[in-house]
Amino acid sequence: MKFCRCVRPFLTAVALSLVAISIADSTSLSAADSETSSDDSSAISKPVLVEGRRIWDQAKHNAFTDLLRHKNRWYCVFREGSAHVSPDGALRVIVSDDGEKWESKALITSPKYDLRDAKLTVTPDGRLMLNGAGMIADAKIRYYSMVWFSSDDGQTWTEGKQIGDPGFWLWRSQWHKGMAYSMGYATYRDRTQRTLRLYRSKDGGTFDTLVDQLSAPAGCGEDTILFRKDQSALCLLRHETGDKMAQLGTALPPYTDWKWRDLNLRIGGPNMLQLPDGRILAATRLYAGGVRTSLSWLDPKNGKLIEVLKLPSGGDTSYAGLVLHEGLLWISYYSSHEGKTSIYLAKVRIPSQ
């Protein structure tokens, strides 16, 4: 098990050199680090951290990641700014051939918005698509969802275009059968007024409302949608009112009728994927017992998240990107457990059932 902590001074478009060192002294994956359900976790397959490395820390605050593998290259996108919320927020895209040496590909800025929470996908016609949001902290309508496209593998990007409805945050887009789906949550300051809307797009540039108001409890926030092999859909949803337990939504085609249920943990920044064997693994921020970024098995039938691996993390942390590649799960995330809020990359081995 190795954990690499190597960052050299930044040179634009010059690769970062990274050297592996042991994680054993700095990270303990003891049972005390794990928050599980009341089930006997001894029978649960537990992923193993193989390697981790810090890959970027050049801004004062580096956060909110996503990860993509495209044309045999790794793409990681995240926000750079002077603080967690600051008017100078910009979106940095870095690339790597091997996951060790990274170089800056693009920096997307705005004179008007604090740019936040970028997500990367590939459109059906092969373009890179970057979703994010522009924030004006003191405005009546604070958030505007936006999209950018690149036809040259991330070297240049189109001007940002607003999508969805003003004040609704389309947090992540998922492509399914040629259509992009995105949950958008209302960003009222009063969290009890925050509702959820489902959007759909043919091209990623124009999102139409598919369901105006879903029946998810008020106070909803960040989400991720998973389309399963049987064509059913799941939505893992952050919930920030009442007991603050995460929500799980389920739907069948055409995805207009969603059923919601409480899960057993409070979460933030959710992402998830389905393994080839059908199991579902989620990456989230967990709160009980200390804030951290962790992997959990999602049990949709019983409505449970079962934590199985705490990543080296703490403090200001979460917002993971997930890619399954050559038998390992690659995870980008951000954390401040080493002091400065920085971008990390972990590789995890997932045991078979």
Which residues are covered by each model-predicted region?
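Bacterial N-terminal signal peptides
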Residues: 11-25
